[in-house]
Amino acid sequence: MAKQGSKEKKGYPELKEVIKATCKIRVGPGKETLTEGNCLWALKTIDFIFEDLKTEPWTITKMYTVWDRLKGLTPEETSKREFASLQATLACIMCSQMGMKPETVQAAKGIISMKEGLHENKEAKGEKVEQLYPNLEKHREVYPIVNLQAGGRSWKAVESVVFQQLQTVAMQHGLVSEDFERQLAYYATTWTSKDILEVLAMMPGNRAQKELIQGKLNEEAERWVRQNPPGPNVLTVDQIMGVGQTNQQASQANMDQARQICLQWVITALRSVRHMSHRPGNPMLVKQKNTESYEDFIARLLEAIDAEPVTDPIKTYLKVTLSYTNASTDCQKQMDRTLGTRVQQATVEEKMQACRDVGSEGFKMQLLAQALRPQGKAGHKGVNQKCYNCGKPGHLARQCRQGIICHHCGKRGHMQKDCRQKKQQGKQQEGATCGAVRAPYVVTEAPPKIEIKVGTRWKKLLVDTGADKTIVTSHDMSGIPKGRIILQGIGGIIEGEKWEQVHLQYKDKMIKGTIVVLATSPVEVLGRDNMRELGIGLIMANLEEKKIPSTRVRLKEGCKGPHIAQWPLTQEKLEGLKEIVDRLEKEGKVGRAPPHWTCNTPIFCIKKKSGKWRMLIDFRELNKQTEDLAEAQLGLPHPGGLQRKKHVTILDIGDAYFTIPLYEPYRQYTCFTMLSPNNLGPCVRYYWKVLPQGWKLSPAVYQFTMQKILRGWIEEHPMIQFGIYMDDIYIGSDLGLEEHRGIVNELASYIAQYGFMLPEDKRQEGYPAKWLGFELHPEKWKFQKHTLPEITEGPITLNKLQKLVGDLVWRQSLIGKSIPNILKLMEGDRALQSERYIESIHVREWEACRQKLKEMEGNYYDEEKDIYGQLDWGNKAIEYIVFQEKGKPLWVNVVHSIKNLSQAQQIIKAAQKLTQEVIIRTGKIPWILLPGREEDWILELQMGNINWMPSFWSCYKGSVRWKKRNVIAELVPGPTYYTDGGKKNGRGSLGYIASTGEKFRIHEEGTNQQLELRAIEEACKQGPEKMNIVTDSRYAYEFMLRNWDEEVIRNPIQARIMELVHNKEKIGVHWVPGHKGIPQNEEIDRYISEIFLAKEGRGILQKRAEDAGYDLICPQEISIPAGQVKRIAIDLKINLKKDQWAMIGTKSSFANKGVFVQGGIIDSGYQGTIQVVIYNSNNKEVVIPQGRKFAQLILMPLIHEELEPWGETRKTERGEQGFGSTGMYWIENIPLAEEEHNKWHQDAVSLHLEFGIPRTAAEDIVQQCDVCQENKMPSTLRGSNKRGIDHWQVDYTHYEDKIILVWVETNSGLIYAERVKGETGQEFRVQTMKWYAMFAPKSLQSDNGPAFVAESTQLLMKYLGIEHTTGIPWNPQSQALVERTHQTLKNTLEKLIPMFNAFESALAGTLITLNIKRKGGLGTSPMDIFIFNKEQQRIQQQSKSKQEKIRFCYYRTRKRGHPGEWQGPTQVLWGGDGAIVVKDRGTDRYLVIANKDVKFIPPPKEIQKE
């Protein structure tokens, strides 16, 4: 009993798997399931109740016995609930024991109850059956076939309970599910064939699945007919399927085999359809996407259906049915609208015609046009219909005269079963390969057939290294059957029977392997799955130079080949090399070298991770002495240059190098030596017969050889897209699937003639296809490894960093992001094991690239569309994207910045690289989109800054990268950063102060605007995901809130800020006016305005407040000989304040040891590297270790006094006014003035005022200028008119054949001019918008020309708020100012035209001369006057608005509600909605007065005016 108890504690081992399956059954509708404790409780309770059964094993018989006994028990009222739980748990255990998988406890009880109903009341049932069938044998009781006592059989209908149970399982789990298959196999063992097929037909399920099941049954029937010729004792298909038989006839014993075969066929069909439904290419899973056209959907659907191994009627049914049911909702509605009730029976061509426009932008307009189009005449139906079989219009596929297509040879006119080529293959001679299993291209020179015992029979099998599986035509049924298996090869898809654990014997070696029984195979094949186990190998090396053209190679002139002795190798490596070389010799790849071949190249070997040895050859010396060949292939093909194809195939050439013979006269130079251990025998010398690995010409010889072999074949197939790189072949086409595979077949057969093998395990049919590191998909491409490894902060070796960067650079054509900080990290020590330190900035830069790689996908090239290349400003690099449609890039890339080149030059360099890439990959010249404006690029070209522009180019606005709008002008949760930047104390400074207490400041050169942006950039770098930024720069504030998508980004600081902000969650930007008493804003302004002590480097330590100086650190171990001085440069740059100087002193610990610092004074404002001069006063050498504190830096205040001369009253040096008192300082400016005049030809007054030279000297310069004397203006110009600020005149003028529109501001004389195409109103209105945008005028005067008086022009002037007047007709004085400007402009233009290449540039130079270089009598130019007037207007407007805000009033105060006397007048300090604030003069206090006690009065000035 003790032992039994211990066994019970351990549970029930024989029911371990049963209990495990039972624990998956749910208790109710929720997710709660039975537990192991529930099962053990039920089993132990049963053992306790029925002690007589306790020792019996838990079989299904024992469980049924317990179930019957439990039914006979009546529990007490208090135990009914536990008793019901016991019964339910037992029912679940019984179902698991029988292999059933009910989902819930209730379902398990129903199953047991149903099975119990089939067996309960046996006596009552027996009596009932005995009445119906008196001759029934009572001991054999099965339904619906019943055995009669007379020896015959009868039939009874399938019970409704069983039928309902099967219906329930089919609805819950599916018609082809394992549950339904298991239930049907259980019940149908005694059914007739007719019962099985009728019940299967009445089951609920997908109609397409039922058609596929019927097709599989038809295939089984055809296979039965082929394998079992008609005979006296052979069952026919009609007998197996129960056709033409009554129920009584089908129930007889002679039909038992037919019923079993029928059930087996049904089970096989269910399994085949189930496996088919889970495959990725299942047609029923091909559904139309929302963004996909109906034609593309049909192409994918037909491709999937054509690939299915089913009969043509089923394919036709699937095409008609799935083309409607799997279409999108829009297409279904369109088909319903167009085809009406016959939509389910319509052909695919009719549905494509109906849905041709669904999804396009003009869909609604086309529907409207169709509705308004008159009805066509009858009799024209089908004229535009297109046959999907031959591709010709005028008929449908089912009416095609070309007939059906053979799935074996790809030809039209016959079916596969009637194919002559297939029959001829069955009569091939020994050595031929199986065309159905392997492609017909593997035609080697008589591959051997060997005798293999398969099961109990000896067979001659063809040794085929290209076949994956072992194929036999018949089998003795030994082993374990594993059902049907689908074999896919280049020749098509076929189906066979798989058997495992089959006894195989070759000579004395016996194994248990796997075979495939394929009755239609013309030859039996031993595949790779069993060759290795049996120790069989086959090398088919083709070394016949008659077939493969040989490429001539030779040594350089005067070279005699390598003569390098073989170095010693260990015993282990010699054994590994011997094994490899022996194998190569057997395969015919190396041969024994004759004695007079004296050259030698060393060999060695390494052990791979798998434990096998790999042979390596040191060809460095031979490579040096060998003449080079031209490069056959200049680069790697790129998927962005591929065209989108319907079908693709990727092939790999096996043993590519070892198939091509080496040029025979050259072979003597490739000799190598196999050493003999301990010199126990002579060495063995070999030479290479084929292209060896590691030889520098192997790739070139291989590529030239393949070029010669494939040239003719490629020319014969212009309809395909063919690519080859080394041993990888790409084939793409838009042909039908059979035709495409036929071309692949043809290529394989063609190169097989030269001995090249195409292993099937490396062949890829269809998408996705892996090729050259890329992964090709139907509509896109990406990299095979579409992720980059993560990096973390901390040390990293240069070797590992280089590998990471290499992975990134390889994927740049999908990333397109620069990594300047990571690249900078690679600078310095070039030792591979040297360490670098990864910081947070590097991690962020790397993560940005990883995220971009996840998001990006490349597209294919369309030869009918133009190609565009768009360049953009990146982080210290130029980034560009190549595309044909927006948002669908072909590829992207990065060109890193080049020193000493401007931004424009760098962009042009990147554009050159982009153009070159596009031409190489597509053969087209791209249209280049440059950032900025066209005028800027034309000016850069004219000025000579750039010397090349693309053939086709234009400009664009906006940066396509920044789309995220997460900057708002509201407060967000998070810290606040107060930023400021600008020129402080003559130096650029920037920084921020955060609400968290964090501070940052730094010196940096730049303009005020740049420094303000840099301060924001630094705050964004350090700030969290949510933060606030406060700035007093209106420029920076408006930039942060600007719509960046429409901004021309030319500022690299702005681009970097955009990238930082793009990665934030949300940023609140706020503006405050500067110097207005806001505490935090004043604090940051003071903080960066201080001249602060700044350091760079790690050579100094922070000091305590009580320390005298800062400790300096020795950068490395320094050795100072006795009595000598050494200068030590430390890792420190320092920036002293202007009122400081510093001294480097000796530390007392060093002075005690006789080591002193010499000198060491640092002047105020010094910004360089610190050097320490050390003197060793000892008589022995002193060593200062690295990191030791060896000196100190002491800061001192700077005191400056002027030196007064003693007795000397005159100075000899130059003063502020020149040499002594001569005043001749202006003489040095005369050459500068002459040079300036030669550029701009300004007048004498301008030269006099700008360069400070005498008026007479300036006039001499003008008079000596030949250009100015030839183009002299008239001395008097008459005429005048109204003048005023912001009042302009406009008119057209002509210069040679060019028309110029001239504007002049009448107050300042500022001129604005543009070359126009004509004197039209449209042209004038366009120029008016440009003029208004730059100058904001108020009024304009013109003549009565048609362009000026047009109605549209008047409406535009009214819209812009410009007061427009016209002059007096035929009175030139009304336009005198602009007429005089015409003459001045043309006179100056004539002087400058020879200096410029383009007329527009000369016109711009003229405006510079007249507006900026021309000075008036007061020394001001027209531009100065115009700007001064604008500023005065602003100041007046501001003062006026301030004046309007100042108010005065009388007021009275109240005491206990009673008003006092009126006081005042006084100024209102603040005014609100219901009260004001004033200052009481008597008490000097601020009072709040309600509006009812206030009387406002006019300002004092207005009182005086009155």
Swiss-Prot record:
<protein>
    <recommendedName>
        <fullName>Gag-Pol polyprotein</fullName>
        <ecNumber>3.4.23.-</ecNumber>
        <ecNumber>2.7.7.49</ecNumber>
        <ecNumber>2.7.7.7</ecNumber>
        <ecNumber>3.1.26.4</ecNumber>
        <ecNumber>3.1.13.2</ecNumber>
        <ecNumber>3.6.1.23</ecNumber>
        <ecNumber>2.7.7.-</ecNumber>
        <ecNumber>3.1.-.-</ecNumber>
    </recommendedName>
</protein>
<keyword id="KW-0546">Nucleotide metabolism</keyword>
<keyword id="KW-0677">Repeat</keyword>
<dbReference type="Pfam" id="PF02022">
    <property type="entry name" value="Integrase_Zn"/>
</dbReference>
<keyword id="KW-0255">Endonuclease</keyword>
<dbReference type="GO" id="GO:0046718">
    <property type="term" value="P:symbiont entry into host cell"/>
</dbReference>
<dbReference type="GO" id="GO:0044826">
    <property type="term" value="P:viral genome integration into host DNA"/>
</dbReference>
<dbReference type="Pfam" id="PF00098">
    <property type="entry name" value="zf-CCHC"/>
</dbReference>
<feature type="binding site">
    <location>
        <position position="1379"/>
    </location>
    <ligand>
        <name>Mg(2+) 3</name>
    </ligand>
</feature>
<dbReference type="GO" id="GO:0004170">
    <property type="term" value="F:dUTP diphosphatase activity"/>
</dbReference>
<feature type="binding site">
    <location>
        <position position="1343"/>
    </location>
    <ligand>
        <name>Mg(2+) 3</name>
    </ligand>
</feature>
<dbReference type="InterPro" id="IPR045345">
    <property type="entry name" value="Gag_p24_C"/>
</dbReference>
<dbReference type="GO" id="GO:0009117">
    <property type="term" value="P:nucleotide metabolic process"/>
</dbReference>
<feature type="domain" description="Integrase catalytic">
    <location>
        <begin position="1270"/>
        <end position="1430"/>
    </location>
</feature>
<dbReference type="InterPro" id="IPR002156">
    <property type="entry name" value="RNaseH_domain"/>
</dbReference>
<feature type="binding site">
    <location>
        <position position="1241"/>
    </location>
    <ligand>
        <name>Zn(2+)</name>
    </ligand>
</feature>
<dbReference type="InterPro" id="IPR012337">
    <property type="entry name" value="RNaseH-like_sf"/>
</dbReference>
<dbReference type="GO" id="GO:0015074">
    <property type="term" value="P:DNA integration"/>
</dbReference>
<feature type="binding site">
    <location>
        <position position="728"/>
    </location>
    <ligand>
        <name>Mg(2+) 1</name>
    </ligand>
</feature>
<keyword id="KW-0548">Nucleotidyltransferase</keyword>
<dbReference type="GO" id="GO:0019028">
    <property type="term" value="C:viral capsid"/>
</dbReference>
<dbReference type="InterPro" id="IPR036875">
    <property type="entry name" value="Znf_CCHC_sf"/>
</dbReference>
<feature type="binding site">
    <location>
        <position position="1291"/>
    </location>
    <ligand>
        <name>Mg(2+) 3</name>
    </ligand>
</feature>
<dbReference type="InterPro" id="IPR008919">
    <property type="entry name" value="Retrov_capsid_N"/>
</dbReference>
<keyword id="KW-0808">Transferase</keyword>
<feature type="binding site">
    <location>
        <position position="1237"/>
    </location>
    <ligand>
        <name>Zn(2+)</name>
    </ligand>
</feature>
<dbReference type="InterPro" id="IPR043502">
    <property type="entry name" value="DNA/RNA_pol_sf"/>
</dbReference>
<dbReference type="InterPro" id="IPR033704">
    <property type="entry name" value="dUTPase_trimeric"/>
</dbReference>
<dbReference type="InterPro" id="IPR001969">
    <property type="entry name" value="Aspartic_peptidase_AS"/>
</dbReference>
<dbReference type="Pfam" id="PF19317">
    <property type="entry name" value="Gag_p24_C"/>
</dbReference>
<keyword id="KW-0511">Multifunctional enzyme</keyword>
<keyword id="KW-1179">Viral genome integration</keyword>
<keyword id="KW-0167">Capsid protein</keyword>
<dbReference type="Pfam" id="PF00607">
    <property type="entry name" value="Gag_p24"/>
</dbReference>
<dbReference type="GO" id="GO:0008270">
    <property type="term" value="F:zinc ion binding"/>
</dbReference>
<dbReference type="InterPro" id="IPR008916">
    <property type="entry name" value="Retrov_capsid_C"/>
</dbReference>
<keyword id="KW-0479">Metal-binding</keyword>
<feature type="domain" description="Peptidase A2">
    <location>
        <begin position="459"/>
        <end position="530"/>
    </location>
</feature>
<dbReference type="InterPro" id="IPR036157">
    <property type="entry name" value="dUTPase-like_sf"/>
</dbReference>
<feature type="zinc finger region" description="CCHC-type 2">
    <location>
        <begin position="404"/>
        <end position="421"/>
    </location>
</feature>
<dbReference type="GO" id="GO:0006310">
    <property type="term" value="P:DNA recombination"/>
</dbReference>
<dbReference type="GO" id="GO:0004523">
    <property type="term" value="F:RNA-DNA hybrid ribonuclease activity"/>
</dbReference>
